[in-house]
């Protein structure tokens, strides 16, 4: 008996309308190996499609619901550590919502660098500062 052949969409996820900047930041962060981020398979500048390895099918918000109150402190600590690590490597990640994090195989993954910026010189964001200081909640600008 032959094993079932996986479909392309089972292995890869294609994100539409990805700017060159988002692609470059995603690639930069992946190459740093500092946080779990999907591996890029390809990027098409003309169609603005980013094809990456699928790391799961449900975001934290899909799994726990949209309300930050449904998320336990331990998971928020993991997210906070991830955001701090990015910040320490000059990436300001402001789109802190449950839709941009995936738990799979006991790993936490971060996705969607559309609103992330290279942080030179160091810029600040009021919500990110509050979050890094211990606030457990999602950025209301992205809800």
Task: Label each PLM-derived region with a short phrase.
Residues 1-28:
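ATP-binding glycine-rich loop module of kinase domains
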Residues 56, 98, 115-117:
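Short, glycine/acidic-enriched loop or turn micro-motifs at the edges of active sites
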Residues 74-75, 88-92, 104-143:
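C-lobe/activation-segment region of protein kinase-like
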Residues 96-103:
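Hydrophobic residue at the +6 position relative to the catalytic HRD Asp in the kinase catalytic loop
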């Amino acid at each position: 008996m032959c094993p079932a052949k996986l479909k392309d969409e089972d292995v890869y996820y294609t994100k539409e309308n990805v700017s060159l900047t988002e692609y470059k930041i995603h690639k930069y962060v992946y190459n740093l190996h500092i946080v779990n981020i999907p591996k890029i398979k390809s990027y098409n500048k003309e169609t603005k499609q980013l094809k990456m390895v699928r790391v799961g099918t449900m975001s934290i918000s899909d799994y726990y619901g949209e309300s930050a109150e449904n998320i336990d402190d331990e998971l928020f600590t993991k997210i906070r550590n991830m955001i701090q690590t990015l910040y320490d490597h000059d990436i300001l990640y402001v789109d802190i919502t449950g839709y941009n994090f995936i738990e799979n195989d006991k790993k936490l993954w971060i996705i969607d660098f559309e609103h992330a910026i290279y942080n030179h010189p160091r810029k600040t964001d009021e919500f990110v500062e509050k979050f890094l200081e211990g606030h457990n909640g999602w950025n209301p600008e992205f809800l």
